[in-house]
């Protein structure tokens, strides 16, 4: 499992919680993913639409993180539990 750090995914995932991840290099819109963006690791909800890709926190106090074309972005896995 992977340990969550921080409160950006509350209330579904809390600081210090361990989540289980299925290795994957792609994911569907709405999946909770483990990914890297410009060498920074994230656990976020994946949003894919006509505007591109964004990483969404479940905690509303955090703004979405847009993934730009020039960014180095890689999905490592999908959170399954």
Model-derived regions, located:
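Acidic/glycine-rich C-terminal interaction modules and beta/coil loop segments
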Residues: 1-81
């Amino acid at each position: 499992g992977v340990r969550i750090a921080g409160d950006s995914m509350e209330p579904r995932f809390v600081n210090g919680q361990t989540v289980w991840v299925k290795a994957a290099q792609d994911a569907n819109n709405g999946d909770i993913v483990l990914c890297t963006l410009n060498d920074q690791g994230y656990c976020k909800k994946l949003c894919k639409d006509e505007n591109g890709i964004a990483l969404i926190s479940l905690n509303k106090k955090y703004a979405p993180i847009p993934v730009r074309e020039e960014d180095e972005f890689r999905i490592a896995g999908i959170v399954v539990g």
